[in-house]
Curated annotation (Swiss-Prot):
Residues annotated for Zn(2+) 2 binding in this entry: 67-68, 212, 270
Pfam families listed in its UniProt record: Lactamase_B, Lactamase_B_2
Annotated source species: Bacillus anthracis
Protein name in the entry: Ribonuclease Z
CDD domains in UniProt: RNaseZ_ZiPD-like_MBL-fold
């Protein structure tokens, strides 16, 4: 599991930062990539990374402001043009379906793979399978905006091979049956319960990716005990009133959410273009005063998520 930040700026592109898009690479877990937001030129940013459009399985949109969605039509079309055939699902607030369908229709863009568009109308679970569970809550951003909590389900423990070898069970088809938790009988009549030969499960990771938002309770709830919290930091602490007026957060407010939620790690993104050069480091300094395990994303930077 790895983050690749494709765009870390706020509102409009700048020379140093493109607008919002985050790839969550799940190559080891499911051989796929999930994308969170898709601002303009996202597909161009992808060219400079290891992200492959054909591997993008899901796109989660936080809200419908242009700096989070204007790259969608181009990416969807290019994925088809480049030979993508596997299904893709887009999740987002009401209106995302109309935006995509009109853009593709007017531009006569033909998508040759199965494309599903899911409009989120209420908080709660938006996706779940045997590996992951994705929950969402409304944030505070003036228009409908969602944050996402991605929960990796616990992974079954490893088969205790040494324990089996000690009692004379040799590698073979029996190992798989025991790994599956079956009760098996050996040739000598011994009964073995597979569950007795499986180690403790590996706890799944929790990732929280928030859209644009003021400081709000929903952010804390989504981030509770997260392994990684990705939070916007559009403004410095001295501009807290401006952040409130424009439905955004300061770096210090992001750190406060991470602290309250008992998150393990905080990554700041959505940085205003007013912070050029190294001036953005002041945002990092302010956040670390409250929450030491804070990092600030820059375009094309990757962050592995270890167990």
């Amino acid at each position: 599991m790895e983050f690749v930040f494709l765009g870390t700026g706020a509102g409009v592109p700048s020379k140093g930062r493109n607008v919002s898009a985050i790839a969550l690479q799940l190559l080891e877990e499911r051989g796929q990539t999930w994308l969170f937001d898709c601002g303009e030129a996202t597909q161009h940013q992808i060219l400079h990374t290891s992200v492959r459009p054909r591997r993008i399985e899901k796109i989660f949109i936080t809200h419908l402001h242009g700096d989070h969605i204007f790259g969608l039509p181009g990416l969807l079309g290019s994925r088809s043009f480049q030979g993508g055939t596997t299904p893709l699902t887009v999740y987002g607030p009401k209106g995302i379906k109309q935006f995509i369908e009109v853009a593709l229709s007017v531009s006569t863009t033909h998508v040759k793979y199965p494309l599903e568009i899911v409009e989120i109308t209420e908080e709660g679970t938006v996706f779940e399978d045997n590996e992951f569970h994705v929950e969402t809550k409304r944030l505070s951003h003036g228009i409908e905006c969602f944050g996402y909590r991605i929960i990796e389900k616990d992974i079954q423990g490893a088969l205790l091979v040494d324990k089996l070898l000690e009692i004379g069970v040799k590698p073979g088809p029996l190992f798989k049956r025991l790994k599956d938790g079956e009760v098996v009988e050996l040739e000598n009549g011994t009964i073995l319960n597979g569950n007795d030969f499986i180690g403790p499960p590996q706890k799944g990771r929790v990732i929280t990716i928030l859209g644009d938002t003021r400081y709000c309770e929903a952010s804390r709830e989504l981030a509770q005990d997260a392994d990684v919290l990705v939070h916007e930091a559009t403004f410095a602490a001295e501009d807290e009133q401006q952040a409130y007026d424009y439905f955004h957060s300061t770096s210090k407010q992001a750190a406060s959410i991470a602290l309250q939620a008992n998150a393990k790690r905080l990554i700041l993104t959505h940085i205003s273009s007013r912070y050029q050069g190294d001036t953005y480091k002041e945002l990092l300094k302010e956040a670390r005063e409250l929450f030491s395990n804070t990092e600030i994303a820059t375009d094309l930077k990757s962050f592995p998520v270890d167990r």
